[in-house]
């Protein structure tokens, strides 16, 4: 079958495209711009057109799109004119799963689902189960970063931003939490949002939930948490090299967990994975070995650069909700106790910023200094009065040293540079390219670091 993917550079779309390509289908696609994913897919032999155009047409049997692709996209318009079926990516992905009829491990929720999915996949690979993996991020141990084809069960990250996620029926499901992100896709109805999690839970054989989550804890056949749940934490210690935690089951000391990835939130992610595999009757010794070996996912506290002479670090992170940012900064302050923490944050989506408003500033105030950029729209229409300046204003009212830049190239004028500093480039948009430019400029100048201040402090 000949399949055209509109927006093939997206992390979820590229994984599905890879799956169909490696299963013998004639795959090609288009993207609004060149990305690392489009370059990788092209290297494998998948034709990709940039940008979108009605001329990007090879008489496909099927067109796949995401909700981010508008109905007036020229390729979608042409598909309708040519009477070619158009399917949403998530709908098509469900069809793939139904077609293949394999055992399914799924992870959904607001925060931590990519890392938790990666942990599940890593464990199954360690156990020689040969999983097929669809990941919403890049993990070095997967053959194609965000995808790997196997002969065993399917592991996938299930995006709750679309209500259709409730139509899936995995065998096993971890719900990390449910914080009402993307509520605009549920008619701004918390009840409708909750119902979607309830629906998918009814379709699942085993559900693992966070015992301290208000919306979904009751859905779990088994639960995990800090002090509440089937699996809990008795104590935890952490250093730059590793962290350890003592896990209790039903209130009794059960095992010791060791992780190389930092952050208390990752202890909870691993606890969810332990709860899952223990409930399924797996021998936990190799599961714990796999978790200790786990090295994380790209753009999740990824150290992109370190200058030992000046002790300057540059770290990339995908955090884009207030809770994720709070977890990130708590981790940074734990790992880098003696360094200054500077955050360069790019808000993601107008709808999220409007809904969360002051919550971003409350999370960001954990940093020593903050630079806020304008919003990365993620194909949303701009909303009047909604701007990154909202966060800047809130930070100033909290007494935090903060700066605002409207355009990313202006960052170099305002980033406060000094020795013994950790620069965190944070967001789900294109802020990572600013991180790379910052490192390039720093390496090229490599003079004695001096503090640079902008006029919009």
UniProtKB/Swiss-Prot annotation:
Gene3D superfamilies: Mur ligase, C-terminal domain, Mur-like, catalytic domain, NAD(P)-binding Rossmann-like Domain. GO terms for biological process: cell division; cell wall organization; peptidoglycan biosynthetic process; regulation of cell shape. It is an enzyme of class 6 (ligase). The keyword Nucleotide-binding applies. Pathway: Cell wall biogenesis; peptidoglycan biosynthesis. Keywords: ATP-binding, Cell cycle, Cell division, Cell shape, Cell wall biogenesis/degradation, Cytoplasm, Ligase, Nucleotide-binding, Peptidoglycan synthesis. The keyword Cell cycle applies. It catalyses: UDP-N-acetyl-alpha-D-muramate + L-alanine + ATP = UDP-N-acetyl-alpha-D-muramoyl-L-alanine + ADP + phosphate + H(+). ATP binds at residues 109-115. Disulfide bonds: none annotated. It is found in: Cytoplasm. One of its GO terms (molecular function) is ATP binding. Its EC number is 6.3.2.8. One of its GO terms (cellular component) is cytoplasm. HAMAP family: MurC. Belongs to the MurCDEF family. Cell wall formation. This is UDP-N-acetylmuramate--L-alanine ligase. The lineage of its organism: Bacteria, Thermotogati, Thermotogota, Thermotogae, Thermotogales.
